[in-house]
Regions:
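Macromolecular interaction modules
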Residues: 1-107
Length: 107
């Protein structure tokens, strides 16, 4: 199963408490309805990021994806588009996001 990580930065002036409330009340709930997502959590970054102390990142998302093609379709769906609209219109500084997809190395 692929895992996508998204490292994010709040827009200037956005209250972290408001963003985290939106995560719990909206984002997590919508993610659970998308067929491609097996699990999704966002983690608050605490302390410096060694090697990138000035990056300004605040959160890292971990998204377990069942099927990448379906994931792209889910993001393009009305629910996915509304989620992304709210996320980037109200909370996150999109140009400062870093994301990558991984796959576990089997034993």
């Amino acid at each position: 199963m692929k895992v996508r990580y998204v490292i994010t930065t709040l827009k200037q002036g956005v209250d972290a408490t408001a963003y985290e409330r939106w995560l719990r009340e909206y984002d997590y709930k919508v993610a659970k309805t998308l067929p491609s997502i097996a699990s999704y959590t966002t983690h608050r970054i605490e302390g410096p990021i060694h090697g990138a102390e000035t990056a300004g990142w605040n959160y890292i998302e971990r998204i377990e994806i069942r099927d990448m093609d379906q994931y792209q379709r889910d993001l393009a769906s009305p629910a996915g588009q509304e989620l992304l609209h709210q996320l980037y219109e109200n909370y996150l500084e999109r140009p400062r996001n870093v994301f990558f997809t991984t796959e576990a190395i089997a034993e």
